[in-house]
Amino acid sequence: MMMLNLKKLSRVKIPLLILAFGFLSLTACQSDFTKLVKAEAATGEKYTDLIFNIKMGQTQKDFYTQCWELNKKGLISQGPGNQSVLYVIDSTSTFFPSDNKIDMLFYGVFDDKKNIVGMKMKFSYAAWAPWNEDLQSDDLMNQLSSDLLAPYPGNNFIDFDTKDEAHPAKVKIDGDRQIHMFILDSRYVELRIENTLLKYNL
């Protein structure tokens, strides 16, 4: 079993394409979305669970310790270039089951104090190929829109207009939690979980 190189992992982050699309910095023309964010925050609902008992507010050391324990159990492995953690979602997955195997890469987002303030994820079908029309990223995002409601219950995902037809996006707001995902290319869907109180200074 390949063991995680946590020392090296601590120096790298998942490459995340930061698109020039609106929901990373809301503008006045998106007032409906802004109202939604504020209304959900006003409910007082708090969501700290991220994945595998990793939670908002934990330290970077906590993150590495939990990943190490999961790796020893054979539940996760080292991602490409040791820049992330790899978890394979299949029909027996406790995260959510999928008949088509899905590779999920994830890595914590940390603030200046090295506390967890979010999570980055990247999904792709394990059997993806350019000619496999049923395993493209648009199919995957549609599947994730429903399957992710199991580990992250609450409101449904809604379409978010990025003004970029090549990178359609969806977003889900529950209390102080925002989950947004977008199509990176024909293979990958990227996702980020964040705290709206921190993100938008609410």
Predicted features and spans:
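Bacterial N-terminal signal peptides that target proteins for export
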Residues: 4-16
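Sec-dependent N-terminal signal peptides
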Residues: 15-23
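C-terminal motif of bacterial Sec signal peptides marking the signal peptidase cleavage site
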Residues: 25-28
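Bacterial signal peptide processing site
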Residues: 30-33
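Post-signal-peptide N-terminal segment of Sec-exported extracytoplasmic proteins
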Residues: 49-85
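Long, charged/polar, surface-exposed segments that mediate recognition or autoinhibition
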Residues: 96-164
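An acidic-aromatic pocket/loop used at catalytic or ligand-binding sites
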Residues: 102, 121-124, 171-202
